Amino acid sequence: MRIILLSGGSGKNLWPLSNGTRSKQFLRLLTAPDGGKESMLQRIVRQVEEAGLNVPITVATSQTQRDIVVNQLGNKVEVVTEPERRNTFPAIVLAASYLFFEKVCDPEESIVVMPCDSYTELSYYDCIKRMVKAIEANEAELMLMGIRPFDFSTDFGYIKTENSGGDFFRAVC
């Protein structure tokens, strides 16, 4: 199993603290276990380690944010840089291509793709472990984690599901 963290957004949601160069995921606003401050990116990597997911992490980011990622995480992760921002899907394709062609990963290896600016509890990673086990047991080829919406917004996509009798739901096509 490998993890791709998506960290290429412009992150203007916390303007003026964040901007096109310094996105919200790099701001050290969260309290770390040692009482110091950590960024969302640092928190996600720490939580992955605390959850026992001792797997390689690749961060997909923009060229302008590469140095910030390296500064905050050092050699804990590998960094893949997009020549220019092209949104989520191209970032995933670039990182997956890097893993396949440069790192020569097994094409059957599970890859977890997640944003680096999530604020989650450790139980989130238990769910990821269960999802990977389901993939490895050939229960599915692709899995997507989502939440039930409280109301609807045109900002998000929605998936119609049906209960498959287990921990997971199947998408209705």
Per-segment meaning from a language model:
Residues 1-69, 75-77, 81-86, 98, ...:
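N-terminal glycine-rich phosphate-binding loop and ensuing alpha1 helix
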Residues 25, 167-168:
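Intrinsic disorder/low-structure terminal segments
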Residues 37-44, 107-111, 170:
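Glycine-rich, flexible loop segments associated with nucleotide phosphate handling
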Residues 74-167:
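Conserved beta-loop-beta/alpha segment of the NTase-like Rossmann-fold superfamily
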Residues 159, 172-173:
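Polyanionic, low-complexity intrinsically disordered segments
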